[in-house]
Curated annotation (Swiss-Prot):
One of its GO terms (biological process) is auxin biosynthetic process. The active site is at 36 (charge relay system), 113 (charge relay system), 137 (acyl-ester intermediate). This is Amidase 1. Belongs to the amidase family. It catalyses: a monocarboxylic acid amide + H2O = a monocarboxylate + NH4(+); indole-3-acetamide + H2O = (indol-3-yl)acetate + NH4(+); 2-phenylacetamide + H2O = 2-phenylacetate + NH4(+); L-asparagine + H2O = L-aspartate + NH4(+). Its EC number is 3.5.1.4. It comes from the Eukaryota. It comes from Arabidopsis thaliana (Mouse-ear cress). Changing residue 113 to A/T: Loss of catalytic activity.
Amino acid sequence: MATNNDFGAFIEKVTISPTSTSSSPPSLQGLTFAIKDIFDVEGRVTGFGNPDWLRTHSAATSTAPVVSSLLEAGATALGITIMDEMAYSINGENAHYGTPRNPIAFDRVPGGSSSGSAVAVAARLVDFSIGTDTGGSVRVPASYCGIFGFRPSHGAVSTVGLTPMAQSFDTVGWFARDTATLKRVGCVLLQQHHLNPIEPSQLIIADDCFKLCSVPHDLLVQPLVGSVEKSFGGNTVVKKVNLGEYIGQNVPSLKHFMTSDDVTTQQEFCIPSLMALSSSMRLLQRHEFKINHGAWISSVKPEFGPGISERIEEAIRTSDEKIDHCRSVKSELITALSTLLGEKGVLVIPTVPGPPPHLQANVAALESFRSRAFSLLSIAGVSGFCQVSIPLGLHENLPVSVSLVAKYGSDGFLLSLVDSLAAFI
């Protein structure tokens, strides 16, 4: 159970010492980290955010390779963090174990599902932490808690030893308060030990996406554009694109997910092609979640909290219809975005539609925010491209952020880029 003196971040406090045997100083020596309760640690039951899951599963017989690699690199783990049940929320509220307290905005949600991991970093309880990001579970809490969050290219970091949510989207991500630590951790997890700064060929600002966001456009975009100019001397091409229009024209399989609601919803709250992209992503997530956990749910009949329960019921009812179309959307989107970005282009989008919502917010208002959030989160989610959420301080006393997205496999480039820009943002 979470305790009061740690912002409610931890489900269990336990020190796991480094295992490095190298004669030279390991790369993460002296750093501490926290582990989301989705990763196996030998000898303990992985809780997956739900007491019934904890009760009906056995202790892990081995530790997830991603955790082992961090320990081998010299880092010390200080505990296991709270997460949203079954990783099925981006809100950060857990009806069973309590909601980790957002250190930057006490009356706002911390974001999920990697809520405790983000809070532990933001509250300076650890130097970095690991989480997972399926539909936004690293990017969202990073934004809400005012820290850096990195979602790698899908498959770039091993997912062995973590409880799956939806394998087509599951990634291992990490949080840090500064880009130097973010990069150091990335070098270990990505097994890339020499990441030199590379100038981006173009900075592509998805102008229409910023209309989904309540934070003023210039407040998010100008610091980034200015930092690129200062870092690289103004050689990077900066251009704007209507991303929704581009995706709509170049991902034809999205037609299977377009609805009349997408077209008639007010423009400031909806980009039809991105709504369709979000629908495709969430359908395939539900399908894979059902395959992974449907039998356990039917057998155990676990108790789920509000919001989670309804989402899981919907997943259990999901049919196989349109699943092939989901996979076509993914393939077409990868091609379309690869063409748009070129070799070293970077896409600029809001991480989320605005500052973190209030705790126990109105359900209808929260659903509108969630819908716009998934329009943004599905871009990297479906394509499998890497994305970093960059904190930009406070707006009206609440944390705000912007994101950079780079093509599949460009993780090292993106980590080095954000590290180069940090001094000027």
